[in-house]
């Protein structure tokens, strides 16, 4: 019997009257999968329940932060203790120092770090700092990589490889867009041409070291080192956006996993243990330019707030335990191999990318290595697959171009159930 979403439908109707689009982040509206969203009432471990009582195995994990699973006892107990003392003070606390110390010890390139409240704040602040440090204006980003919703990075490619970017959102002034150059992910040859043309104007390259916002797209062999070499040659900074990959690919993030060191690193998601958080950090000589130590201004009322710091500390302590990342990799591989077999059995052409506990099933015959090949995916097939999986109690990303997240709370039984459901869902997708 198909699940009922009556209460969710009523809530969504009410929400649309008072919240733009009925949601506080666009992907949650489920537009690209052709349905309205269920409203979630609670979660525990690998499961979520909506307001109609439907139960789901959750592979969004709050878009990445819940690497331990929902309501992990260590995080909940730490937060309860913190709440007894207060929520926020607008003053320094030992918790900020503790988490900052943990970050600098974990991430090979980070000598100093500044806490903020979101990944968007982190990347916005890192770009300002890079421009100040280099005394240059232009930024290179990559098509399909998402770094938050601030003006400098809401940019798509222009009509030619070396043209200035143009905004992807109304309200982004063209003079801001003109300082952002959009390149192709995994294309070093194009980057070399860009640097030959305007290298002396480029302040920084910002990149997801493992792309996660066009679906999961790994860096080609030598790509990240090529970025490092180009930045060294032209005195530009290399910024890794590790909001997704930080503490996800390894305890040292993507930079340790791929052994390529950026100048600045942006963080979020996992380091807040499920609470709003962001951070940016890097080499001491660069970070000492941040106010009040230096002239580059950045501030925030709730930056480093006790609750987020507490949840982050508790989460990272769990991730320090032996075997954690091996377990995540094992479970993620078990899921991916099961999905590959289910797709083949259902006669669906699909391409799978997986790195550690991140993966994406693309509905395309092409190997996905950049935005163009990701865009070859059949989004109608994905939508049919998604809806069928949701009906069977499997909660995936409501968009083709997002990651599937595996957590420590997922069990082999969860994965077995997911693979069984996927066979039916792939057959439904094949009819599209």
Curated annotation (Swiss-Prot):
Keyword Oxidoreductase: no
Organism: Desulforamulus reducens (strain ATCC BAA-1160 / DSM 100696 / MI-1)
Molecular function GO terms recorded: glutamate-1-semialdehyde 2,1-aminomutase activity; pyridoxal phosphate binding; transaminase activity
GO BP, sorted A to Z: protoporphyrinogen IX biosynthetic process
A Pfam family assignment: Aminotran_3
Gene3D superfamilies: Aspartate Aminotransferase, domain 1 (3.90.1150.10), Type I PLP-dependent aspartate aminotransferase-like (Major domain) (3.40.640.10)
Protein EC: 5.4.3.8
NCBIfam families: hemL, PRK00062.1
Residues recorded with modification N6-(pyridoxal phosphate)lysine: 269
Protein name: Glutamate-1-semialdehyde 2,1-aminomutase
